[in-house]
């Protein structure tokens, strides 16, 4: 859990913004959303495999686009 120390003469809004930013960097909200409902291990593996395939296809598309621009 991210911890921030409130500085002297620091407005509450600024401290809250710093806390939200540190939570975002730590990935707490995405972790909570991911664990909100139980997901079967097979479904979890299937989702991970699908995201890996999607990442790979994006990478290949970017590399292919670079090759086309060279000529």
UniProtKB/Swiss-Prot annotation:
UniProt feature coiled coil, ranges: none
Asked if the Swiss-Prot or TrEMBL record annotates the protein with the keyword Protease, the reply is no
Looking up InterPro entries in the UniProt record yields: Ribosomal_bS21, Ribosomal_bS21_CS, Ribosomal_bS21_sf
Q: Name one GO molecular function term.
A: structural constituent of ribosome
Q: Which NCBIfam families match?
A: S21p
Q: Which HAMAP family match?
A: Ribosomal_bS21
Q: Give the family from UniProt.
A: Belongs to the bacterial ribosomal protein bS21 family.
- Stated name of the protein: Small ribosomal subunit protein bS21
Q: Which organism is this protein's natural source?
A: Buchnera aphidicola subsp. Cinara cedri (strain Cc)
């Amino acid at each position: 859990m991210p911890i921030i120390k409130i500085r002297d003469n620091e407005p509450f809004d600024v401290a809250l913004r710093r806390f939200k930013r540190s939570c975002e960097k730590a990935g707490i909200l995405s972790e909570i959303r991911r664990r909100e409902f139980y997901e079967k291990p097979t479904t979890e593996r299937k989702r991970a495999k699908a995201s890996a395939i999607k990442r790979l296809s994006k990478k290949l598309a970017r590399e292919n686009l670079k090759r086309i621009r060279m000529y």
